[in-house]
Amino acid sequence: MISKQQISEIISNYDLNDLAIATVCSHSSLQIFDGARKEGLRTIGICVGQPPRFYDAFPKAKPDEYIVVESYSDIPKIAEELVRKNAIVIPHGSFVEYMGTESFAELAVPTFGNREVLEWESDRDKEREWLEGAGIHMPKIVDPEKIESPVMVKYHGAKGGRGFFIAKDYEEFKQYIDPNEKHTVQEFIVGTRYYLHFFYSPIREEGYKLSEGILEMLSMDRRVESNADEIFRLGSPKELEDAGIHPTYVVTGNVPLVARESLLPRIFALGEKVVEESLGLFGGMIGPFCLETVFTDKLEIKVFEISARIVAGTNLYTSGSPYSDMIEENLSTGKRIAQEIKLGAKTGKLDLILS
C-alpha cells in the first residue's frame, strides 16, 4: 500500500486553491460530481471506453472533463495525469471492486479516506473481528452441518446482492454451495433492513462529538432486491420451492427510510462504537460509511456488514434527507465529502483525511 508519507509529498505540490474531485463514472458518481460542483470544486470523470451518454441528460452533475481508459486495470497509468490536475480520488463501491483492492491500495493519487480500512472491510473474518471488537451485535456464525433454522450464506467479496443464498438445512446448503469459494454462514435475522449512512469527520468540532472529531448520520435507506422483493406474489415459499423458483438478492434500486426517533440514540451509538474501534485498529475510518442492519420486532439492531465508503443508497438524497437537512439544507453525502476536503485544505489538515 502506498504510504501516507508518499501521499503527503504529492499533496505538498498541489495548488490547494484549484483542487479537483475525480472518480469512476459509475455507482454514486453523479452525486459526487454534483456535490463537488455545488462546493465550487472541479470534477474529473474516469471512464472505460466512451464517456457515458446519459451524463448529458444531467448537466449539473456532468463532470468538467473526462479521462478515458481502456480498462479499469489501466487506471494506475493515469495517476500522473490526475496528480498534475490536483485531483483527489473519491472511492466508491464500483471503483474499488472493478479496479481491485490491491491496485487501488497502490494508486499513487491522494484519495479521500483511509485506505487502511480496505484490509478490514474486504475480509469477512477481519470485518467481524472489527465489529464484534466494537461491541456490535452481529448474526451468529453457524456450522453448516449444524443448521437448524434458516441461514444466510455469503461469499466473500459479494457485491450488489450477488453471492448470497438462504439455506434451511445442511442438505440445501450442500445443494447450492460452491466449495471453491470462501464463504460465511450466519443465522438469518428476521426483521426490517435499514442501511444507515454515517459520516465521520476527524477535523470538524461542532456536532456529535467522539474522542476525536464528530459523527454525523446523514440518511438511511432500504435496498430493492430482485427477485426477493416480488417473488412471493407468485405463491407461498413452499409453492415456489416446488416450482423450482428460488429467491435472489440482486440490488436494483433503493427506497428512502426514516427510523423511530426513539431509536436514534442506539443508531448513533452503533456508529460511534465502530468509529472508535477503527481509530484503535488502523487510525480511523474517514468520511462516509454505511452500517447494514436488521431491526427486529424487539427493537434490537443487528449489524450484518459495513461498507466503509459512500454507498449507492445515498443517491436518494442529492438534495438532502430528512436528517441531513437538519444539519444543512440540501446536504448530500457527495456535497459533504467536498466540504470536508475544502475544510481540510483551508485548515492545513488534508493529511488527516487523505491517504
Curated annotation (Swiss-Prot):
Residues 101-332 form the ATP-grasp domain. GO terms for biological process: 'de novo' IMP biosynthetic process. The keyword Protease does not apply. Binds 1 Mg(2+) or Mn(2+) ion per subunit. It is an enzyme of class 6 (ligase). Its cofactor is Mg(2+); Mn(2+). GO terms for molecular function: ATP binding; ligase activity, forming carbon-nitrogen bonds; magnesium ion binding. ATP binds at residues 144-195, 225. 5-amino-1-(5-phospho-beta-D-ribosyl)imidazole-4-carboxamide binds at H27, S94, N254. Pathway: Purine metabolism; IMP biosynthesis via de novo pathway; 5-formamido-1-(5-phospho-D-ribosyl)imidazole-4-carboxamide from 5-amino-1-(5-phospho-D-ribosyl)imidazole-4-carboxamide (formate route): step 1/1. PROSITE patterns: ATP_GRASP (PS50975). Its EC number is 6.3.4.23. Keywords: ATP-binding, Ligase, Magnesium, Manganese, Metal-binding, Nucleotide-binding, Purine biosynthesis. Pfam families: DUF1246 (PF06849), DUF1297 (PF06973). It catalyses: 5-amino-1-(5-phospho-beta-D-ribosyl)imidazole-4-carboxamide + formate + ATP = 5-formamido-1-(5-phospho-D-ribosyl)imidazole-4-carboxamide + ADP + phosphate. The keyword Nucleotide-binding applies. Belongs to the phosphohexose mutase family. NCBIfam families: PRK13278.1-6. Catalyzes the ATP- and formate-dependent formylation of 5-aminoimidazole-4-carboxamide-1-beta-d-ribofuranosyl 5'-monophosphate (AICAR) to 5-formaminoimidazole-4-carboxamide-1-beta-d-ribofuranosyl 5'-monophosphate (FAICAR) in the absence of folates. This is 5-formaminoimidazole-4-carboxamide-1-(beta)-D-ribofuranosyl 5'-monophosphate synthetase. It comes from Methanococcoides burtonii (strain DSM 6242 / NBRC 107633 / OCM 468 / ACE-M). The gene is purP.
